[in-house]
From Swiss-Prot:
Classification via PANTHER family: DNA GYRASE INHIBITOR (PTHR40055:SF2), TRANSCRIPTIONAL REGULATOR YGIV-RELATED (PTHR40055)
Function statement: Inhibits the supercoiling activity of DNA gyrase. Acts by inhibiting DNA gyrase at an early step, prior to (or at the step of) binding of DNA by the gyrase. It protects cells against toxins that target DNA gyrase, by inhibiting activity of these toxins and reducing the formation of lethal double-strand breaks in the cell.
InterPro entries: AraC_E-bd, DNA_gyrase_inhibitor, DNA_gyrase_inhibitor_GyrI, GyrI-like, Reg_factor_effector_dom_sf
One CC-aspect GO term: cytoplasm
Gene name, Swiss-Prot/TrEMBL: sbmC
Protein name (Swiss-Prot/TrEMBL): DNA gyrase inhibitor
Entries under SUPFAM superfamilies matching the protein: Probable bacterial effector-binding domain (SSF55136)
Phylogenetic lineage: Bacteria, Pseudomonadati, Pseudomonadota, Gammaproteobacteria, Enterobacterales
UniProt keyword annotations, A-Z: Cytoplasm, Stress response
Species assigned in the record: Pantoea sp. (strain At-9b)
């Protein structure tokens, strides 16, 4: 797995925040977002922003934002039921990987193991996120960028 530290800009987004087990909320959030995006003919980067550590937080307390990036000046119509937010920029530990058979758990575990081998960077309190480069919703196979927020030790 090739990894690197990258500097990412802040990214503005529209999307849905859901709470509960990620294996349920992520597909649900993207289904909602896909319908909303189709009605508004928008284009952008598809991402999932994760809140909570699944090794210590009960599944029902985990949260995710399923989002599409938009320009900074994007104006969201009132009453649409969708949220507008900003993903913080800064340093991130990055990899581009292929997930097979929807096994995101193994991909994240391997990625975190790579970070733990480094002594010069540590995880900070911003959320981890995925940027999807392909749609694996039918095949279960995904190409994506994974990001862990970090700060120097």
């Amino acid at each position: 797995m090739k990894t690197s530290i990258v500097e990412r800009p802040a990214q503005h987004w529209v999307g849905y925040r859901l709470q509960g087990p990620w294996q349920e909320t992520v597909p649900q959030g993207f289904a909602q977002l896909k319908d909303w995006v189709a009605r508004h003919a928008l284009q952008g980067e598809w991402m999932a922003i994760y809140y909570g550590n699944p090794q210590v937080v009960p599944p029902q307390e985990l949260s995710v934002e399923t989002v599409l990036t938009v320009p900074a000046d994007f104006a969201l119509a009132v009453g649409e039921g969708i949220q507008h937010g900003t993903l913080a920029g800064g340093h991130y530990f990055h990899t581009c990987t292929e997930v097979q058979n929807n096994d995101f758990f193994s991909a994240w575990n391997a990625f975190f193991a790579q970070l733990q081998q480094r002594s010069d960077w540590q995880v900070d309190d911003r959320p981890c996120y995925e940027h999807y480069l392909s749609d694996g919703s039918q095949s279960g196979n995904w190409l994506l960028n994974m990001y862990i927020p970090v700060r120097p030790v």
